[in-house]
Amino acid sequence: MRASLSILLLAGLLSGCATQGLYDWGDYEADLFDYYHQPGDKERVIENLVQHLDRMAAKGRKPAPGLLAEAGTYYLLEGDAEAAVDFYRQEAAAWPESRPMMATLITNLEAN
């Protein structure tokens, strides 16, 4: 009985020690590496990021800071300024501290 209680207590303590990250980055780190080191995978990387952002939105969760802007930049580099502006607006709405930078990017893109 005492051994069972000890095991349960230990299991409870260990499960309580698991840390949750503040933000859900998905596979961003690995995908970012692939984006720059495996240029043929750029479309897959962009698709993975957008799917991750869609999953976050479906769960009602706020994306990690900068992920929406990163998606916008990927689209901008692919020549889709309209999609880039959309993601920059989403970033500004999600993270107010990014508004000045996002507003500048949007203004510059809309001027061209």
What label would you give each PLM region?
Residues G66-L67, M102:
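The tetratricopeptide repeat
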Residues A11-D34:
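Bacterial Sec signal peptide processing site at the extreme N-terminus
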Residues Y23, K62-P63:
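Residue signature of alpha-solenoid helical repeat architecture, marking inter-repeat boundaries
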Residues E70-A71:
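Structural register within alpha-helical repeat arrays
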